[in-house]
Amino acid sequence: MKVEVYKGAQGKHNLKDYEETYNTFDWKDVEQAFSWSETGKMNMAYECIDRHVDQGLGDKIALNYKDEYRKESYTYKDMQRLSNKAANVLSEHAEVDKGDRVFIFMSRTPELYFALLGVLKIGAIVGPLFEAFMEKAVADRLENSEAKVLITNKALLPRVPVDKLPNLKKIVVVDEDVEDNYIDFISLMETASDEFDIEWLKSDDGLILHYTSGSTGQPKGVLHVQQAMLVHYISGKYVLDLQEDDVYWCTADPGWVTGTSYGIFAPWLNGATNCIAGGRFSPEQWYSMIEDFKVTIWYTAPTALRMLMSAGDDIVEKYDLSSLRSILSVGEPLNPEVIKWVKKVYGLTVLDTWWMTETGGHMIVNYPTMDVKLGSMGKPLPGIQAAIIDDAGNELPPNRMGNLAIKKGWPSMMYRIWKNPEKYKSYFIGDWYVSGDSAYKDEDGYFWFQGRVDDVIMTAGERVGPFEVESKLVEYEAVAEAGIIGKPDPVRGEIIKAFVALRKGYEPTDELKEEIRLFVKEGLSAHAAPREIEFKDKLPKTRSGKIMRRVLKAWELNLDAGDLSTME
């Protein structure tokens, strides 16, 4: 199959020569960017905010915020002052100490960011929660982490089962007219001191505890530590390409790892102006966000790009998006059709990035200056050794599908699974962290995602990666979304079954099923063509936009779908 290539960009970029940088890279050199390389005193919040104030950038805009009711900007000096106030409120009134788990369960407003930085200045471990979580998802995470303090909004309080959480000592409410049995964050912020003695930490002290769901069992707590900032910083520099005058917008919610690693840490470690949008998605709101703040670098998800794509090309003409110089994507692989649409409408090559909660930061990505092979994951971040291995830990040659693995020891690698050391050990084969994703590496060193290992289909002796088939399905004009699974078959072992959501204007017919099947057969191969197609009004997706194939499989085989707290 012929691969389409978009040429890398020319001009002023932080990463000029990928191969040279990769071959000479040393994490020790990255440490020089931080004050702790000289002082030995480490704290993520200091490096994100106070360091820039101390270096004379206090008047630079750190945060632009906009929702239906508010439009505000805060300088780095403002953020220093307000995060100090938040730290004082939390330490004095909520009795937060170093190492405590403090969870944040609230809507996206500036106060969330003040509070999160305040938690980190105390030396506590922050636990982000997505605001759409319901009671069980909240309870599972607070109970497992033994969270001491929760910061939330009044509207979300009914989802917090306080009587089932004996370790939860204090609840901080960020709202007007707070009841006396809660800590009134906004009122206390007004009178709190704007000076705070930051808790200095070691590289392996706790930073953030993200819970991630699997196909079985309860969500697991993935702990990252202070030294993760090395990966956040250098990926912000080389991948996001953050420079002095950039205005950056990451659309991910801070309840998810992208919303913290790349919605908070990476931009502020690099001294960028960071934009936050409150409220719900709409094409008009998003385009006006870019226009109003003159966003230059935009980090979003394929699902969002597909939603903008379905809104049409005409709406784009109503907004001035000329400030944009880079668009990146995360959360699921980019279908080539989306890449082509972005190129046509915005005139930019959207850059796919691969990583996961457990890795803490970018691992395999596409870079502004490097040629993009449409549909490829790209190449490893400098400092990251990636490979395709078999189940015994042996590296496989080019173009052989296997386990996508990373050589352990990078700074943002998960430090532990909270209270589950056996689960932590299960991620590794020898010195390799095994991602659970299936991929292959081509002869040029580009990696190609094929799906979760559990999702790879063996049909009549052939291995088929679901993503390749799904990408072909959504190229067909009638198909809006597609997910495929392997369905047990007595003759072939498995057959490919596709679940398809149609675009408006198309009716689900047997004739259309056959047209779609032939389209895949002619575009890929006979063994990759679905033998069964089922039409659905919508497909199960995570809130970050990934098709939940395990749910499709559970539907088909009448199985338990596992934890559904992340399903939209």
Task: Locate each region found by the language model.
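Conserved AMP-binding/adenylate-forming core of the ANL superfamily
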Residues: 45, 59-117, 134-139, 184-190, ...
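AMP-binding/adenylate-forming catalytic core of the ANL superfamily
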Residues: 136-143, 148-154, 291, 298, ...
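Conserved AMP-binding/adenylation subdomain of ANL enzymes
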Residues: 230-247, 254-297, 310-311
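Structural core segment of the AMP-binding/adenylate-forming
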Residues: 2-6, 10, 117, 121-187, ...
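Conserved AMP-binding A3 loop
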Residues: 73-77, 199, 207-231
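Conserved ATP/PPi-binding loop(s) of AMP-dependent carboxylate-activating enzymes
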Residues: 380-383, 394-426, 462-464
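Gly/Ser/Thr-rich phosphate-binding loop
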Residues: 269-272, 295-300, 309-372, 385, ...
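Conserved pre-ATP/AMP-binding loop-to-beta segment of ANL
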Residues: 59-61, 173-176, 189-211, 218, ...
